[in-house]
């Protein structure tokens, strides 16, 4: 058998191991060294066993894969060639690692004899992602003296680790030339495959049958005591299914419920980021005996300040075993899904122990509406974001100012899926992630990002052409990084080194990539054009051009005025 044919046979085993693990999507960047992996992934697509996606920019491709992984909860494979192509996946690897989404990086490599000798496009790739992957596999150059069963077992063992912990696997696969002109008829019939032939012909068969670790949570030994006390529940980022029941549980206990925009839990005390600026309410909330926090990655600065200031009994509930304790609490930690925790901690019906947050939250609803006004701007879009969403769809929110405005000013429908990149909270790859969420879900998706984020990920506008159902990408153009208006930095330095003001507009970008584009000036105009956009099969870019400091100024004004409100 020729080298090129055995390369393909070796790659066939790798991609089939991933198929049996649950990979349904292969995201592929162009490259020569990865040809064996690419062609075998395409073979799965031709057999209608998987979908293949392509993109010319590995950084965007990584985030596109992350978006698919977010919405499907399935592992997603990424195939790239050798060299800096691998390094371009680093931001997506970091984000997926911190949020436990399952990415599998398949990096093709030069064979060992070409590393460290000046060969073209050859860099040390083993361990390139440092400690971010939860499993790393550095395969040898394909050779028949390695047992085929060993190759399957090596891949599947890494997958078993990922199935239990989430996160990223890095599989580095060297291939020697030649890479082309393989004997297609010999790829699947080589005697080397004989030990795994029954596995290979049955897509449902796994080489390693591992049982998922069952970590049943037990009721806290003092729950009967703590459920009679004054409590506050804080809900951070949660999957939709885990948020079900938290609101009713909190209301039965009579405890205050504070929810993050990523929680997918209906807020009975919305606008917490605003009303917690009031020191009287903040201090009364600190009189709680116990705080229970579900999930993490909380957006609100004032909610985080409350958590930092609280010194009582603190319980943290999260399905992963990561150390979540930014404020060094003496805490009790439950490694459990939220709904599993609720099941074994039945509530005791009590009257609410603190009414001021409810009263101030209700006041904020009318006050915010009055302050935001009827103009179309970033604050009013955040406050009324529900009005631009599809009935059954997704919301993807970028980072920086807008996610804070949504968290502070809006009340989303119960259980509406919200996606973010709040693991490392970077602005890279946001368009690509939104495209992945839309592609992976097949549902109408609204994404909202800032202008600097859009400029940072401009290549990924190309990915929007892969979406064939109605989706809306809002670009809030405040001519720079408005989030930095919140910083106490001297004006000239802020302008030149933080804000980076510009005069760019996004209509020419939409034209270049062949994407529908609208620029509304009023809410009536927006709603009329959105009706048309939701009737199209594809993505529409909506540019909202706003004054550079309006959003940040309104945000600061709301916080200041509520902080000064008199509370009896």
UniProtKB/Swiss-Prot annotation:
GO MF annotations, alphabetized: 2-succinyl-5-enolpyruvyl-6-hydroxy-3-cyclohexene-1-carboxylic-acid synthase activity; magnesium ion binding; manganese ion binding; thiamine pyrophosphate binding
Top-level lineage group: Bacteria
Keyword Zinc in annotation: no
Free-text comment on the cofactor: Binds 1 thiamine pyrophosphate per subunit.
The enzyme's E.C. designation: 2.2.1.9
InterPro entries, per the entry: MenaQ_synth_MenD (IPR004433), MenD_middle (IPR032264), THDP-binding (IPR029061), Thiamin_PyroP_enz_TPP-bd_dom (IPR012001), TPP_enzyme_TPP-bd (IPR011766)
Keywords, ordered alphabetically: Magnesium, Manganese, Menaquinone biosynthesis, Metal-binding, Thiamine pyrophosphate, Transferase
Cofactor(s) it depends on: Mg(2+); Mn(2+); thiamine diphosphate
GO biological process: menaquinone biosynthetic process
Catalyzed chemical reaction(s): isochorismate + 2-oxoglutarate + H(+) = 5-enolpyruvoyl-6-hydroxy-2-succinyl-cyclohex-3-ene-1-carboxylate + CO2
Pathway: Quinol/quinone metabolism; 1,4-dihydroxy-2-naphthoate biosynthesis; 1,4-dihydroxy-2-naphthoate from chorismate: step 2/7; Quinol/quinone metabolism; menaquinone biosynthesis
Cross-referenced PANTHER family: 2-SUCCINYL-5-ENOLPYRUVYL-6-HYDROXY-3-CYCLOHEXENE-1-CARBOXYLATE SYNTHASE (PTHR42916), PROTEIN PHYLLO, CHLOROPLASTIC (PTHR42916:SF1)
Function noted in UniProt: Catalyzes the thiamine diphosphate-dependent decarboxylation of 2-oxoglutarate and the subsequent addition of the resulting succinic semialdehyde-thiamine pyrophosphate anion to isochorismate to yield 2-succinyl-5-enolpyruvyl-6-hydroxy-3-cyclohexene-1-carboxylate (SEPHCHC).
Subunit structure: Homodimer.
Similarity comment text for this entry: Belongs to the TPP enzyme family. MenD subfamily.
The protein's name in its UniProt record: 2-succinyl-5-enolpyruvyl-6-hydroxy-3-cyclohexene-1-carboxylate synthase
Source organism of the structure: Actinobacillus pleuropneumoniae serotype 7 (strain AP76)
Highest classification ranks of the organism: Bacteria, Pseudomonadati, Pseudomonadota, Gammaproteobacteria, Pasteurellales
């Amino acid at each position: 058998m020729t080298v090129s044919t055995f390369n393909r046979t070796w790659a066939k085993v790798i991609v089939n191991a991933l198929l049996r693990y649950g990979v349904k999507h292969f995201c592929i960047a162009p490259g020569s060294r990865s040809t064996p992996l690419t062609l075998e992934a395409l073979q799965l697509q031709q057999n209608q066993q998987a979908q293949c996606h392509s993109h010319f920019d590995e950084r965007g491709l990584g985030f596109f894969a992350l978006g698919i992984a977010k919405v499907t909860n399935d592992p997603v494979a990424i195939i790239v060639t050798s060299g800096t192509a691998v390094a371009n996946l680093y931001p997506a690897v970091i984000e997926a690692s911190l949020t436990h989404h399952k990415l599998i990086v398949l990096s093709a490599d030069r064979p060992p004899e070409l590393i460290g000798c000046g060969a073209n496009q050859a860099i040390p790739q083993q361990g390139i992602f440092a400690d971010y992957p939860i499993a790393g596999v550095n395969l040898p150059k394909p050779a028949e003296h390695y047992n085929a069963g060993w190759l399957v077992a090596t891949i599947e063992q890494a997958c078993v680790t990922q199935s239990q912990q989430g996160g990223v696997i890095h599989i580095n696969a060297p291939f020697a030339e030649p890479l082309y002109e393989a004997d297609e008829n010999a790829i699947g019939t080589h005697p080397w495959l004989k030990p795994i032939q029954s596995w290979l012909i049955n897509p449902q068969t796994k080489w390693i049958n591992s049982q998922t670790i069952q970590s049943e949570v037990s009721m806290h030994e003092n729950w009967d005591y703590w459920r009679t006390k004054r409590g506050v529940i804080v809900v951070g980022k949660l999957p939709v299914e885990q948020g079900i029941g938290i609101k009713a549980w909190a209301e039965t206990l009579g405890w205050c419920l504070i929810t993050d925009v990523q929680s997918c839990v209906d807020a009975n005390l919305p606008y917490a980021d605003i009303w917690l600026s009031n020191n009287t309410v903040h201090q009364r909330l600190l009189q709680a005996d116990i705080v229970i926090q579900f999930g993490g990655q909380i957006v609100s600065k004032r909610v985080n300040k409350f958590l930092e200031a609280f010194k009582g009994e603190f319980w943290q509930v999260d399905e992963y075993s990561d150390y979540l304790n930014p404020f060094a609490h003496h805490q009790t930690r439950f490694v459990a899904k939220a709904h599993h925790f609720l099941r074994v901690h039945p509530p005791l019906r009590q009257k609410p122990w603190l009414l001021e947050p409810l009263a101030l939250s209700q006041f904020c609803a009318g006050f915010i509406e009055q302050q935001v006004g009827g103009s179309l701007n970033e604050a009013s879009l955040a406050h009324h974001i529900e009005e631009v969403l599809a009935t059954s769809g997704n919301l993807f929110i970028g980072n920086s100012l807008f996610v804070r405005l949504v968290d502070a000013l809006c009340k989303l429908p119960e259980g509406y899926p919200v996606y973010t990149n709040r693991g490392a909270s970077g602005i890279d790859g946001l368009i690509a992630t939104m495209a992945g969420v839309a592609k992976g879900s097949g549902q109408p998706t609204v994404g909202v990002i800032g202008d600097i984020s859009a400029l940072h990920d401009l290549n990924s506008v190309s990915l929007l052409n892969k979406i064939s159902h109605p989706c809306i990408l809002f670009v809030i153009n405040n001519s720079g990084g408005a989030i930095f208006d919140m910083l106490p930095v001297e004006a000239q330095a802020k302008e030149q080194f933080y804000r980076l003001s510009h005069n760019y507009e996004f209509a020419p970008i939409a034209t270049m990539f062949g994407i529908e584009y609208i620029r509304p000036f009023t809410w009536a105009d927006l709603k009329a054009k959105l009706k048309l956009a939701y009737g199209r099969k594809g993505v529409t870019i909506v540019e909202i051009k706003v004054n550079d400091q309006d959003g940040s100024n309104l945000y600061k004004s709301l916080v200041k005025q509520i902080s000064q409100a008199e509370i009896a």
